Amino acid sequence: MASSARPPLTAAAWAPLLREALAREGRFRWPLRGTSMLPTLPVECEIEVAPLPVPLPERPRERLHLGSLVVFAAGDILVAHRLVRRAGGQWVMQGDGRRAPDLPVEPEQVLGVVTAAYQGGRRCWPDRVEPAVRWFWVARYYLLRPIRFTWHALRGLRGPS
């Protein structure tokens, strides 16, 4: 008996659909799962995603800023994490509730920027302190970077256990 279940959509299949929806509608809402953005975003909230800002010749500084929450494709899932670094044409993101950053991604993997979060129909993010909080998370990335580097170097010197 043949199964009638459809195979799940892959990122290659749904990312263009989401980009098209963003271009057509200007925004979309997406349910957020997981704890990687705690304490900033509550578990099982709904995020509002808008297109990335496009720098124009007359406004060259209008671009995505460090500390912005972005949505990107990682494998076959959507991830909402904070942009903490741009390096060598790639972007590095990190969840506020994570100790280490994500692997670098190509800018083409980034689908949009999070503009708001809702829980129970009420807006829960951003709040008045978000501009200061944004810089706290970016600073944390840079302050912990030498510690992570040293930790990995020392672990490499120990050899296999």
Model-derived features with residue positions:
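Extended hydrophobic leader/signal-anchor segments used for secretion and membrane insertion
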Residues: 1-161
